[in-house]
Amino acid sequence: MAFNENRVINNYAEALMEVSGKQTAKVLSELQVIELVFERNKELAQTLDDVSVSSQQQEAFIGILGKGCSTTTKNFLETLADNRHFSLLEEIVENLDQRVSASNNHSLVIAKTAIPITAEQSKRLSKIAQKKFGYQHVEVKNVVDPNVIAGVILTAGSKTIDGSIKNKLVQLNNHIKQAVGKE
């Protein structure tokens, strides 16, 4: 994910948190349900973000999707449509969820590993994340990414601890390049 996308995702989540106020939990719940629709139909977000889809078609879809939702949620969906950012919905909802959890001194920590982790490893990572990130309660969600090679990348909101072999190899490569460049 590009740095600019991360900034956009953070901005959306922060704005949603601010605008929804005491209704944040409700808005988050509504968006999680809507996210399931997009999760089941992967091409839907790309289609809605496509410039060939007219504003009227987007509005019609939002009318159906947002039926029964709060005004804040509907307005947010309209903003995503206007900016053609439906493809970022999953990450925005995840970011908002992390912000809500953090405001309750609870955090969802993403543990990116090359292979699935065991329940025992999840407990150990939870304790490590509590100490490193400063949360009282931590829920660990494992995301498998073969690019990690080995080790783990822990992410809580905008904070990351990269203990992956891939990162260590990149650092080693940079040190070697610097050493060779100085000779």
UniProtKB/Swiss-Prot annotation:
Membrane topology of the entry: Peripheral membrane protein
Protein location: Cell membrane
GO CC terms, sorted: plasma membrane; proton-transporting ATP synthase complex
A GO molecular function held by the record: proton-transporting ATP synthase activity, rotational mechanism
InterPro entries, per database record: ATP_synth_OSCP/delta_N_sf, ATPase_OSCP/dsu
Superkingdom of origin: Bacteria
Gene3D superfamilies (alphabetical): N-terminal domain of the delta subunit of the F1F0-ATP synthase
Function: F(1)F(0) ATP synthase produces ATP from ADP in the presence of a proton or sodium gradient. F-type ATPases consist of two structural domains, F(1) containing the extramembraneous catalytic core and F(0) containing the membrane proton channel, linked together by a central stalk and a peripheral stalk. During catalysis, ATP synthesis in the catalytic domain of F(1) is coupled via a rotary mechanism of the central stalk subunits to proton translocation.
Protein family according to the UniProt entry: Belongs to the ATPase delta chain family.
Protein name, per record: ATP synthase subunit delta
Gene designation: atpH
